């Protein structure tokens, strides 16, 4: 009994297990017909996708019926199209007819039917790709070579009878290129490609499309190597052309670099800056004094021998306050203003005159030995000490006006520096000087003079020392140096003496522009100053040294007599800081750089510009 | 269209002399009874033009159907009802290539004529009815208008071809009568839409048929089945 119960229980258990296993199976899922295609509009194939098979082997059947018929057919061929397919042969294919196709999936548990698919073969035509793709490079005479592409329609398609009309498309690319180049070929089965890169390997593909259907897939690639077209001769020609053009480019660049500035100025002329009428700074800088002055309508400068009479000018400077300056007139002085009133009203550019009321009052009223009371524009010369026969040489270079009052240094007061007139400020005609500047200087000088007088009444130096300003006008055609010659006033306080003042007379101006100064023998001075006997006059042509700033010590050429005098005077000077300074300067100047010496016509000139540079 | 065809006929005399010299090897055509050489040339032109027209008509019809379906009847399964509902199905036209190749070219030409004639009336009404639709779709309407015009032209050309290929014999003008007009004018929107759908579906099919037949005929007649 118990054994039976046990076996019963086992049996039941096994039964339960079997039942459970059986419950895991299910009828198949619904299949789905996903594609039907006809390659030539004479046959077609449908493919389906099976649903879940439910764990059991499933049988699929395809059934269909046609439009206008009631008979249901089954798929004639399950094999040709592959798994899960149905192939309809010619016999079973009708065009312009709707097929209603369904697929049955059956398994042990059950079956399921797919949704019917309505298929009209007319609209599902998709041919195979074309076949026999051949490539050939043709080299016709007198023409560029081209690629000739040929192919044949797919084998199944009947084009001859006109049942299907195909249109073709080819594409090609160089092997390494990324993009295809597509060409529509129409209904022809050949194509010529003209634009090719020589030496490249090309890949070509072709596909086709029926008149009312789908494009086929691309055919397999065909490749061809394009022969290199360029002959050695062509390459040589191109290399030659490249080299030639490179050379031309380099030449052009070089020419532009050299002449670039002039070309640029030719195209874009520089905008002229404001100019004083008739005055050209560039000429001034270049030392073309003649041209510069000619712009003003000046006479030649330096004055020739004819102008000697012009230069007989001198100033009498007296330490007495009462004494007036008596400007000497040159006879043939042409040009503006010997006197303030004679100023040429038209030629007033930049040139002040003592006519100006303010200046006039200041200068003309002060009878002090104001060396700056200049009426004669030619040369302002300071009467020197008895020994101060100074000849200065015109250094016909740039105009500059610098002067200094040596005795100021004695007083400890600051030596005033004559305002440095820039070349640009000299808009006067040669040989006229800038009266206004002169007057200003005169006024400043006056003040200084007054101070000096006040401080040291004992000294009569007030009138003695004058800063001589020398203006030098550009006269010569010589270019180059912008030397400034200085007329010396250098005298220092040591030179102050109670002696009566001496006058230095401008004797003449040499042709080479050297001023010859004469020590005035008489009180009245030699007015005309015609070429006096040179023997009696001492020519001061040598610059011994430069004192302070901008003061040249001119020395009589033949002898060192005056030099000695000067030097003594220097030593006598009461020491003062500035004096020491001046000594230092002198000492430094005495060893003036030899290169500052200029040789010109037997006369030694020191280029003050050198000193200037060393000073400043 | 009428002018074009008459111009063609008028040029026959002009071409006569030149064609005598130029025409050499062409497909020997038994279809020009008078034996005039110019017959072939003009026939070729006629066929070329006919094929161009038929191809164009089918292309337009296909586009029109697709647009209509997409816009109005997509997913509504109208196709299931449009089975065997074309009025021209009574015309026994060949259903595959073998049948078409077996039929004689004259009969095939006649079939083309019959189908073309059968569509005169429906196309005319299609235009008027599409115009009357609310929100008349411009694309569909313009295509309908053009199809109607081209169809008329094609019909004329085909009659000329038949006159050349088969002169003298004038067959009865057989065609299928279309009676779908009331359906197009139905009040029921769904029924009306289906009527349109059906009409366009049939138009697409028949235009394809005509195109296919004419291409077959052209290759057979002009190129001796060697297209």
UniProtKB/Swiss-Prot annotation, chain A:
GO CC, one annotated term: external side of plasma membrane
Region called Disordered, residue ranges: 326-375, 454-492, 568-593
Extracellular side: 25-234
Family to which this protein belongs: Belongs to the type I cytokine receptor family. Type 1 subfamily.
UniProt xrefs under Pfam families: EpoR_lig-bind (PF09067)
WSXWS motif, short sequence motif: residues: 215-219
Protein name: Prolactin receptor
InterPro entries: FN3_dom, FN3_sf, Growth/epo_recpt_lig-bind, Ig-like_fold, Long_hematopoietin_rcpt_CS, Type-I_Cytokine_Rcpt
Protein function: This is a receptor for the anterior pituitary hormone prolactin.
Compartment annotation: Membrane
Chain ranges on the Cytoplasmic side, renumbered to this chain: 259-616
Primary location: membrane
Disulphide bonds in the chain: 36-46, 75-86
Basic and acidic residues composition-biased segments: 463-482
Signal peptide bounds: 1-24
Membrane-topology annotation of the record: Single-pass type I membrane protein
Molecular functions per Gene Ontology: cytokine binding; metal ion binding; peptide hormone binding; prolactin receptor activity
Residues bound to Zn(2+): 211-212
Alphabetized CDD domains for the sequence: FN3 (cd00063)
Membrane-traversing stretches: 235-258
Residues modified by glycosylation: 59, 104, 132
SMART domains xrefs: FN3
